[in-house]
Structures are given as structure tokens and as C-alpha cells.
């Protein structure tokens, strides 16, 4: 039987994975459960893992997978969440209309997406508008809408599980909920992949690496170009 806090944390992780495909950060879990320190989150996660409700994914920073839910929520083995991805900071310099390239059908279980170039996962840089490359993506990774891919160059999102050299899959959109990892166009000149947060009347572009600072900007300086929906990694 789970404690109340274990249950609340399990439900929060499950809801976030199903909504974004990405595990919430320890800070997000701490805030969601109104705890004062992350050590409490570590203890709750260990308890959930020992009871077989979640498991940690190897070789990924803080990546978690929900295995089953409690009996009062149909306790049963769950299918893997929609590709639990580990996103990282990305830069792209293109407008949403330029990125809305329709996927091209590839093999029966994959889709070919335009690979628009290498994006710095650090300080925002001007996007590389390379339309000559493409990448095959598992069809199960994609939902509705238009998608494109970018290659990560940098380490500003490593605590979100996004590493240098990863390929991130982006769904084109012009808005996103707070806490979502997005491709954001800043001042119509530079594009970056960061976690979007709304702070009062301002917009914060938050890295997942303590070596980088969060940028807080007026909303008229930031345009959402897409949201992270998947990640591919080669070993």
C-alpha cells in the first residue's frame, strides 16, 4: 500500500509522462508535492521503485518509467509511455511556417522528417536553415500535426536527459503550456530549446543545467516555434 505522498508523486509522474513523454524534474516534483527539499523526493522515488510501481531508466539523467498504477487506478502492467524522451537545449532559426514540412512516408513503421540542422544546446544561436537532410522516425513517436527534427549541440539540457548529439523531434506549434520544453524564437533572430515557464507577465526560458542561467523576457520577445515530442540517440 502506498503512502499519500507516494501516490501523489506516482500520479504526477504518470500524468507528466503521458502529456509530454518526459519525466518531471526533481524540482518540479518537489513543488508539486509542496515539499521543502529534494531529499524527500529521492526517498519517495526509492519507495515506489522498491514496490515495483516505477523504474529508473539506465543511461538517462533522472529518467523514470511508470510500470503500474495502484489497484484503485486499475493496478496493471502499463504499456511504455509514448517514448519517454530525454530532451536538451536546441537552437533553430526559422519561423513556424518555414518548419511546417509535412512528413514523408518511409518504411511501414517509420516516417521521414526534415532534419533542419544542428542546434546549440547552450546560448541561443542563429538557426541553420539546412533543408537538404532528413531522418527516419518511428511512426509511433508522432501524433497529429507537422513535425521536424534538430540535432543537439551542447549540454544546457542534460538534466532533462538531452545530450550533445541527440536528435530531437519537434511538433510545430505557436503556443505551449508552462513547463513544456519548446523551440523558442527570441527577438526574431535566435532560436533555442528550453523549458518554457510563465512568471507573472514575463516568460522564462529555463535550461536544465545549473551552469546556465534562466532568461526572463517580455512575452513579445519570445515566439514558440514548436514543442519537444521525442528524442533519438545513437550509441
UniProtKB/Swiss-Prot annotation:
Q: Which InterPro entries match?
A: LexA, LexA-like, LexA/Signal_pep-like_sf, LexA_DNA-bd_dom, LexA_repressor, Peptidase_S24_LexA, Peptidase_S24_S26A/B/C, WH-like_DNA-bd_sf
Catalysed conversion reaction? Hydrolysis of Ala-|-Gly bond in repressor LexA
Q: Does the keyword Nucleotidyltransferase apply?
A: no
| Annotated site residues (Cleavage) in this chain | 121-122
Question: Its Gene Ontology biological processes?
Answer: DNA repair; DNA replication; negative regulation of DNA-templated transcription; proteolysis; SOS response
Q: Sorted alphabetically, which keywords does the UniProt record give?
A: Autocatalytic cleavage, DNA damage, DNA repair, DNA replication, DNA-binding, Hydrolase, Repressor, SOS response, Transcription, Transcription regulation
DNA-binding region per Swiss-Prot/TrEMBL record: 26-46
Q: What is its EC number?
A: 3.4.21.88
Q: Does the keyword Transcription apply?
A: yes
Q: Which HAMAP family match?
A: LexA
Q: Describe its function.
A: Represses a number of genes involved in the response to DNA damage (SOS response), including recA and lexA. In the presence of single-stranded DNA, RecA interacts with LexA causing an autocatalytic cleavage which disrupts the DNA-binding part of LexA, leading to derepression of the SOS regulon and eventually DNA repair.
What NCBIfam families would the database entry show?
lexA
Q: What is this protein called?
A: LexA repressor
State the organism named in the record. Answer: Paramagnetospirillum magneticum (strain ATCC 700264 / AMB-1) (Magnetospirillum magneticum)
Give the classification, highest ranks. Answer: Bacteria, Pseudomonadati, Pseudomonadota, Alphaproteobacteria, Rhodospirillales
Gene (name only): lexA
Amino acid at each position: 500500500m502506498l503512502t499519500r505522498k507516494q501516490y501523489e508523486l506516482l500520479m504526477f509522474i504518470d500524468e507528466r509522462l503521458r502529456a509530454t513523454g518526459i519525466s518531471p524534474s526533481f524540482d518540479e516534483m518537489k513543488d508539486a508535492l509542496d515539499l521543502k527539499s529534494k531529499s524527500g523526493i529521492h526517498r519517495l522515488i526509492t519507495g515506489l521503485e522498491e514496490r515495483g510501481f516505477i523504474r529508473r531508466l539506465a543511461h538517462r539523467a533522472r529518467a523514470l518509467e511508470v510500470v503500474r498504477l495502484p489497484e484503485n487506478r486499475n493496478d496493471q502492467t502499463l504499456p511504455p509511455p509514448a517514448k519517454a524522451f530525454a530532451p536538451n537545449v536546441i537552437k533553430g532559426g526559422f519561423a513556424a511556417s518555414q518548419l511546417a514540412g509535412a512528413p514523408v512516408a518511409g518504411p511501414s513503421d517509420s516516417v521521414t522528417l526534415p532534419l533542419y540542422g544542428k542546434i546549440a544546446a547552450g546560448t541561443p544561436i542563429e538557426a541553420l536553415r539546412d533543408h537538404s537532410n532528413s531522418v527516419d522516425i518511428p511512426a509511433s513517436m508522432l501524433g497529429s500535426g507537422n513535425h521536424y527534427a534538430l540535432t543537439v549541440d551542447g549540454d544546457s539540457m542534460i538534466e532533462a536527459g538531452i545530450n550533445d548529439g541527440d536528435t530531437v523531434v519537434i511538433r510545430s506549434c505557436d503556443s505551449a503550456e508552462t513547463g513544456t520544453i519548446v523551440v523558442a524564437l527570441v527577438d526574431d533572430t535566435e532560436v533555442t530549446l528550453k523549458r518554457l515557464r510563465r512568471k507573472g507577465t514575463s516568460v522564462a526560458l529555463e535550461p536544465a543545467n545549473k551552469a546556465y542561467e534562466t532568461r526572463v523576457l517580455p512575452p513579445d520577445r519570445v515566439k514558440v516555434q514548436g514543442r519537444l515530442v521525442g528524442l533519438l540517440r545513437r550509441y
